[in-house]
Amino acid sequence: MIDGRSKDNSLKIIKKYSNKISYWLSEKDDGLYDAFNKGMKLAQGQYIGIINSDDVYTANAFDIIHKYITKNPKADFIFGSVKKHWGILYGYKPKKIKFSWGFYSSHSTGFYIKKDAAKKVGLYNIKYKYHADYDYFYRMIVKKKLKGIATKKNEVVGIFRRGGFSSTIPYRKMFIEELKIRYDNGQNILFLLILGIYKILNYWKKKIIK
């Protein structure tokens, strides 16, 4: 468990359950993805999974993931379905990652990767403060060509709860970083221009409807 010297009750809760935690660390970090990297470096098992402090696993999450690991030993990673406030985020269509309008397949809460495969991809790029997970997925799928699978839509392994880190980020900052990540990974400039216009129009459409 990695804590960035939280100012809430996180450390108190960690200490309360320390006998049930194999390892915990509380020190200043350089943002969410720096904490992810620390956890990945310390991970001892064959698979790595990450969950943010505001999110939760479903009661049968690990049974579902274990089933897919057992049936698909050659898969490098698994995208598990994640419940969000608007519906369920699910599926895996690798060809769509380059040109998808929105962000990609799973949330970090539903993502599991073999430790050996994670070493091939490297760490999360902490220069990206909001969407380093998309950059990670892009490198993993397009550049390293790792093989993955997804659980069925109704096999939900995690719940993304509003009010966490990503819920407090201004849309403009998220939008700019999304385009930067796509550009840095060599995506088509014409497509990025079209995507930018689409995102802006969609943003103002939602504003007007509200």
Describe every region a protein language model picked out:
Residues G91-E177:
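Conserved nucleotide-sugar donor-binding catalytic segment
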Residues V56, N60-G91:
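Conserved donor NDP-sugar-binding/catalytic core segment of glycosyltransferases
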